[in-house]
């Protein structure tokens, strides 16, 4: 050992030469080849830009991808507040529009922890899920709905009403508006369904052609004169109802159009017979001090009505009164919509009929006004139920099992459909085979075919 130390001390150069020789002889690779060197130097990206590629500028990756940045730091990169805001909405919580939440063709705009749907015409709601065109639920209008030129839903009301503040509902604009029951104790009605169904508002005009289920031109059946199986109405419950007196009292009914005009069935009236109209009537054998009597000074049957050919085709007529009626809670007009909506209301499927006709076939007449709710009968069933002609200006209503119907003496009276508490005239009681017979239905004049004629003839000057 001492010898080694002596050699190292005396010959340091010799030791250095030996160490260099050892290192040069060692098999050690210091440098990597080209392919392996690239694997180390090319680190993986830590952010997949996706939809944000258009925003990647300057030092965005260094500022906001390698570490969390602030809005101000992102603003320094974009140098534009609008583009920074768009980037920031996705950077903070991701793209809220990625799941396509907007329905019915709506476009989505991302926001922080939220999104906004821009809806096309006819749709609204958080996700454009609500269809608000007139075709669906009447555009949420209480009475009438139209699509304006700029594709917006516009609600409107019948005469005597105005739009409420919400621009959807209708409120009375006159003391005694049409179709409203204003006597408080008469509010108990089994109301028809008033929610607008999803209906086709375009196909509301059918051609007036005969549905050829028969070839017979003359008919042998009963004029309706009474509601069978109905209930006693309360005073003022049907304030548009009138009774016609002539050679016989209460031979037909009718409805108040306005202070000067009554609408009834054409087969009820004869131009050579004096007719008296009584409005505000309830019990025809008692004086209740609500009655108003007027004489008829003019009868206008529909111009297509011809009793010699068919007593019940175009079965509608107008009666002009000598003095105007005084409107009150017991004397109120019935509402008459336009052709389109009268047809729509009829399709609701249920209406009220009323009158003082016979309580059963060939039986006694009613003393107190009767009323009955009757369902609309589909046209195919209606045609199969009778051998007589059912024209397109007629419709059937009633019960297959029988027992409830209008009957002799009810003719000319109203078939009304209630819409959100307001009643509209949809039919006129016309004819039927006996009364309340099983498998038979009441036949009514379809008012939608005649509303333009009614309004033209009954204008108040």
UniProtKB/Swiss-Prot annotation:
List, for all copies, the residue spans of the domain called Gla. Answer: 47-92
Active site per UniProt: 267 (charge relay system), 315 (charge relay system), 411 (charge relay system)
The UniProt entry's sequence similarity note says: Belongs to the peptidase S1 family.
What this protein is reported to do is described as:
Factor IX is a vitamin K-dependent plasma protein that participates in the intrinsic pathway of blood coagulation by converting factor X to its active form in the presence of Ca(2+) ions, phospholipids, and factor VIIIa.
**Sites where the protein binds Ca(2+) 1:** 47, 53, 63, 67
Instruction: State whether keyword Mitochondrion applies.
Output: no
Supply one GO BP term. Answer: blood coagulation
Query: Residue positions of the PTM (3R)-3-hydroxyaspartate?
Result: 110
The positions annotated for binding Ca(2+) 7 are 93-94, 96, 110-111
Top enzyme class of this protein? hydrolase
Instruction: Tell me the protein's name.
Output: Coagulation factor IX
Q: Where is this site: Cleavage?
A: 191-192, 226-227
**Chain positions found as Phosphothreonine:** 205
Q: Which residues bind Ca(2+) 8?
A: 281, 283, 286, 288, 291
Residue ranges occupied by any Peptidase S1 domain in the UniProt entry: 227-459
Q: Which residues of this chain are annotated as glycosylation sites? A: 85, 99, 107, 205, 213, 215, 225
Species whose genome carries this gene: Pan troglodytes (Chimpanzee)
Per the UniProt entry, the propeptide covers 29-46, 192-226
Tell me which positions the record assigns to the signal sequence: 1-28
PROSITE patterns in UniProt: ASX_HYDROXYL, EGF_1, EGF_2, EGF_3, EGF_CA, GLA_1, GLA_2, TRYPSIN_DOM
- Positions binding Mg(2+) 2 in this chain are 72, 76
Modified sites of kind 4-carboxyglutamate: 53-54, 61, 63, 66-67, 72-73, 76, 79, 82, 86
Compartment list: Secreted
């Amino acid at each position: 050992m001492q010898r080694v130390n002596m050699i190292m001390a005396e010959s340091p150069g010799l030791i250095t030469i030996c160490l260099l020789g050892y290192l040069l002889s060692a098999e050690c690779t210091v440098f990597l080849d080209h392919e392996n060197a690239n694997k180390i130097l090319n680190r993986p990206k830590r952010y997949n830009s996706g939809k944000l590629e258009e925003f990647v500028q300057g030092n965005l990756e260094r500022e906001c991808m390698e570490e969390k940045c602030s809005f101000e730091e992102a603003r320094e990169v974009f140098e534009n507040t609008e583009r920074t805001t768009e980037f920031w909405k996705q950077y903070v919580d991701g793209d809220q529009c990625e799941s396509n939440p907007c329905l019915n063709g709506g476009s989505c705009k991302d926001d922080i922890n939220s999104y906004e749907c821009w809806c096309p015409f006819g749709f609204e709601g958080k996700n454009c899920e609500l269809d608000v065109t007139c075709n669906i639920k009447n555009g949420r209008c209480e009475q009438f709905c139209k699509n304006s030129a700029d594709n917006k839903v516009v609600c409107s009301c019948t005469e005597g009403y105005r739009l409420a503040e919400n621009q959807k509902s209708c409120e009375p604009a006159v003391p005694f508006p049409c179709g409203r029951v204003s006597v408080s104790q008469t509010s108990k009605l089994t109301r028809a369904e008033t929610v607008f169904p999803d209906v086709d508002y375009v196909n509301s005009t059918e051609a007036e052609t005969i549905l050829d289920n028969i070839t017979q031109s003359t008919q042998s059946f009963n004029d309706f004169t009474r509601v069978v199986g109905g209930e006693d109405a309360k005073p003022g419950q049907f304030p548009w109802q009138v009774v016609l007196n002539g050679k016989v009292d209460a031979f037909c009914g009718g409805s108040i159009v306005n202070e000067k005009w009554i609408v009834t069935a054409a087969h009820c009236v004869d131009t050579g017979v004096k007719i008296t109209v009584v409005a505000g009537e309830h019990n025809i054998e008692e004086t209740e001090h609500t009655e108003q009597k007027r004489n008829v000074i003019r009868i206008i049957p529909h111009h297509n009505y011809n009793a010699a050919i068919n007593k019940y085709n175009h079965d509608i007529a107008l009666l002009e009164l000598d003095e105007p009626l005084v409107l009150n809670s017991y004397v109120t007009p019935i509402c008459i919509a336009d052709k389109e909506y009268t047809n729509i209301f009829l399709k609701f499927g249920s209406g009220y009929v009323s009158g003082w006709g016979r309580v059963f076939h060939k039986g006694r007449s009613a003393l107190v006004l009767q009323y009955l709710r009757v369902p609309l009968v589909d046209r195919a069933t209606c045609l199969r139920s009778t051998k007589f002609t059912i024209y397109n200006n007629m419709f059937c209503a009633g019960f297959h099992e029988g027992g409830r119907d209008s009957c002799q003496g009810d003719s000319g009276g109203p078939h009304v459909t209630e819409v959100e508490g307001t009643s509209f005239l949809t039919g006129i009681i016309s004819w039927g085979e006996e009364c309340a017979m099983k498998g038979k239905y009441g036949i009514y004049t379809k008012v939608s075919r005649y509303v333009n004629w009614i309004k033209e003839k009954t204008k108040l000057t």
